[in-house]
Amino acid sequence: MPDLQYMCNMDWAEKYRPQHLDEILGNAAAVKQMALWAQTWTADSAPLLLIGKPGIGKTSAALALARDMNWEVLELNASDARTKAVIERIAGNSASTASLFGASRKMVIIDEADNLEGNADRGGARAIADLLKTAKQPVLLIANDAYGVSDSIRRICETVQFNIGYTISFILI
């Protein structure tokens, strides 16, 4: 039974976040491309780069994909220090070792990959490019602006475009 007090205090977006890919409305081609990438993933597969406007569902789709695949998640975003040392220590270890919790794989999610500049992320873009070349686990990057992502990172990745669209659903009674 879910923890009702926890659910009552949850942020609306978290409370209603899609838990599985089939719960995502819109961006059917992007969702299909993500699922195919995950189902055929090998250690030689390119990392996935999700591109799209803020709030369109990229992070929700990434988390739903991990849940569908029973993959443990390590998420790094702009609120985390993403220096070279931190990326090598945390993400590097996760991308090259097996899961501790029985999940078949660990997916490293690097959110806001188009914001890897400045003092807080010193050396981060280079460390991520190195990580992507050596990862033995699935790595997924998320960005609002494809051209804000370092060219050395963008060249390595398979890109998935999320577009703003309108979904109209009809319920037949």
Label each PLM-derived region with a short phrase.
Residues 2-166:
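P-loop/Walker A NTP-binding region and its immediately flanking N-terminal helices
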Residues 171-173:
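Conserved phosphate-handling catalytic cores of large alpha/beta enzymes
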